[in-house]
Every structure is written in C-alpha cells, then in structure tokens.
Amino acid sequence: MTTRLSIKTTEGDIIIRLYDETPGHRDNFLRLAKEGYFNGTLFHRVIEDFMIQGGDPDSKNAPKGKMLGTGGPDYTLPAEFVYPRYFHKRGALSAARTGDDVNPDRESSGSQFYIVWGKTYKPAELKQMERQMELQQEQEIFNQLAKQHHEQIMDLRRNRNRAGLQELQDNLIEETKKLCRQNGKPAFTSEQTEAYT
C-alpha cells in the first residue's frame, strides 16, 4: 500500500508517496505532518538539477540570509534503504542525512527531507558512469587485497625486490579481476536507465 500526501507550496502542490517498505520513515513523516510540524517551513536548500530540501523547523519565519539546515527534532531514524527497487530519480522523496564520514550508520534526519529534482542523461553518459563504477569497484577490491598483503609489500620494498613486487602486483591484479567477475559488473537497472534518460 502506498500513502499519498500533498505538500502545498507557493508554487503549487507537490504530491508525494510514502511506501510501506520504509515504515519508520513513513510513520514519522505522517506523524509530523499531522502535528503541523512542517506548516510554514521553507524549502531552504534548492539546487537546480539536483534537489530541493525542506523540513527544517528553524526555517519558519526565518529572516532572509539566515543559515538553515541544522534544525529538527532531537532524534534520527535508522536507515531504511530499499535499493534497487527505490532509488534517486526525478521526483523521489528521501530523508536528509549527514554524510557517511560522520554518519556511518546512515541515520536520517528526524524531519528534514528532499525531493530529487533530477537530471536526465544520454545513454552514452550512463555507459560512461557504469564504466566509472566498474573502475571504482576494481580499485576498491585491489586496495583491499593490497592491504591484506601490507607486510609482504613493505618487506619487498625494504629489500628492494622489484621482481617480487612486480610478481605480487600481477597476482593481486589477477585476483582483482577474478573477484570482479564473481561480483559482476556494476550496472544500472532497466528502471534506472529509463528514469535517467
């Protein structure tokens, strides 16, 4: 079942859907909306072709130029990602959160949300992005393998054993290729390709 709500703005209404697959976020958003929490708040962060962000209670009657984006209730919500079924595409509603470097559990803001404005791409651009994801996957796997062989690498370097280093590097590259084949190439789903083109 999908819950639909209307966000009334000075530019017109925005119809949003809340999904049962994300019950914590759905219930929180509904509760805040029913309490009037969002009434009078602004879309305080608008980035063309990216997203519009709202839900900061500090934006109510905020004077022009006030820094916004840190307000909210005194709680966060556990992550509820349902990827690849739901993903960032034009019109998607998502909970705002701080970055992974300071928020490794990927917890969401208790009230702030954003709507993906989105950008469309040419098929060739999506293919290039897939190639970039593939290269990133290869680099991450290689780095993990190299980390596992750190002491061996350091010993070979200390002993200036270039042949040994080259042999180890070749072995790590082959192991990387093997693991990449097992994992499969990163690729956009047909739904993502349709949404982004």
Give the location of each predicted region.
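Cyclophilin-like peptidyl-prolyl cis-trans isomerases
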Residues: 1-197
